[in-house]
Amino acid sequence: MNFVYNTPILNKINIPNIQFRAAENYAGTLAPKKDSFSTNPLYDNFVDRNTLTQIAKSNPRIMELLKSNQVRLDVNIRELEKLKHGHLMDTRVTAAKIYSALPQNLKSEVNLMDLQQAAMLHDYGKVLIPDKILNKNGKLTDKEKEIMKLHSELGYELLKEQGVNENVLNLVKYHHQTPDGNGYPEITNDFKPDISSQILAAADKYSALREKRSYKDAMTRDEALAVIQEDVTNGLIAPEVYSALARI
C-alpha cells in the first residue's frame, strides 16, 4: 500500500484521543546515549575541522550559498558534537520509535536503517551556520532566518559523494520541506514526500519542541504533541505518523 499525502484530511480523519504518558525527567539537555549510532562512522569521518573545510571549499554550491548570503566559511565542530549527542540522537531514537508504532503496511514502505541515518545527519549542515545565529538569545531577524534555512542544503552538499546513499541524502536535504512543496529548500525532481520523510519531520519537530534552547523553554510532552497535531490538521504531518508518535 502506498501512502498518499496530498489528499485533504481536515474533517475526514478522526485522530484517536490518546492518553498521553507523563513526561519523564526531560530537562532539555540530553546525555549521550550509548548504542550503535553513538559512534556512527558517518560522524567519525567528518569530525576533523580541516577536512570539512576542504570539502566545503571544493564544493561550488556550498561556496555559492555562503557567498550569496554573506556568510564566512567557518566550521563549527563544537556545534556538531553538541548536536550529535543531543538533538540528532534524540531525533533518531524518536524516529525509530515512530516506525515501531506504525501499522505493518506502512512499515513496509520504510527503510529503517536509512531513516535512522538520515535522522542522525539531518542537521549536519549546521556545522557551517554561524554560532551567533545558531545560539542567539531571542528571535532571529529575517536575514538570519534565511541563513539558518541554508543548513538543509549545506548538509546535503557536505555529505554527497562521501558514501551516503541517495535516499538518506534526500531525507537530509528535504527534512524541512512539506508535502505541498511549501517548505525549504526549493524542490527539484529528487523530492519524494514519502512516509520516511513524514516520520523524520515529526521526530525532528518533536525533539526540537521538547528541548530547551537559547531562545526558548522546553515544552512538555502534551504541549509538543498539540503543536504537531495542528500540523496534521494543516496537512503537514500524516495522521498515522502523529498517532504513532503519540503512542510511544
What residue ranges belong to the model's regions?
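Histidine- and acidic-residue-rich, metal-dependent catalytic cores
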Residues: 46, 51-248
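DNA-contacting surface of Y-family translesion DNA polymerases
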Residues: 43
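Non-Sec secretion/translocation targeting segments of pathogen effectors
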Residues: 1-39
